[in-house]
Amino acid sequence: TTLTEPEPDLTYLTFVXIVXXEMPIFVMATANSGITSTF
């Protein structure tokens, strides 16, 4: 994302939504416990 982008959050949420849509369970697990556990 660029600093000139007004609302990067909406863009990110839109992307997540699309991806997530494929496998929301996996995305949720990775976003919540995956990052805190792996990293």
Swiss-Prot record:
Keyword terms of this UniProt record: Fibrinolytic toxin, Hemostasis impairing toxin, Hydrolase, Metalloprotease, Platelet aggregation inhibiting toxin, Protease, Secreted, Toxin
Cellular localization per UniProt: Secreted
GO biological process, one term: proteolysis
Other comments on record: Presumably not injected into the host's bloodstream, as feeding by H.ghilianii does not cause prolonged bleeding of resulting wounds.
Activity regulation text: Inhibited by EDTA, cysteine, DTT and sodium phosphate. Partially inhibited by EGTA, citrate, Tris and glycine. Not inhibited by DFP, PMSF, iodoacetic acid and leupeptin. Requires sodium chloride concentrations higher than 0.15 M for activity.
Organism: Haementeria ghilianii
GO terms, molecular function: metallopeptidase activity; toxin activity
One CC-aspect GO term: extracellular region
Role: Metalloprotease with anticoagulant activity. Cleaves fibrinogen Aalpha (FGA), gamma (FGG) and Bbeta (FGB) chains after positions 'Asn-121', 'Lys-160' and 'Pro-102', respectively. Breaks down cross-linked and non-cross-linked fibrin clots. Prevents and reverts platelet aggregation induced by ADP and collagen. Prevents thrombin-induced platelet clotting. Does not affect plasma levels of coagulation factors prothrombin (F2), V (F5), VII (F7), VIII (F8), IX (F9), X (F10), XI (F11), XII (F12), plasma kallikrein (KLKB1) and kininogen-1 (KNG1).
Enzyme class per UniProt: hydrolase
Requisite cofactors: a divalent metal cation
Thermal dependence: Active at 37 degrees Celsius. Activity reversibly reduced to 26% and 0% at 25 degrees Celsius and 4 degrees Celsius, respectively. Complete and irreversible loss of activity after 15 minutes at 60 degrees Celsius.
Chief localization: secreted
Entry EC number(s): 3.4.24.-
Name of the molecule in the record: Hementin
Tissue and organ distribution: Expressed mainly in the posterior salivary glands and, to a lesser extent, in the anterior salivary glands and secreted into the proboscis (at protein level).
Biophysicochemical property: pH dependence: Optimum pH is 7.5. Active from pH 5.5 to 11.
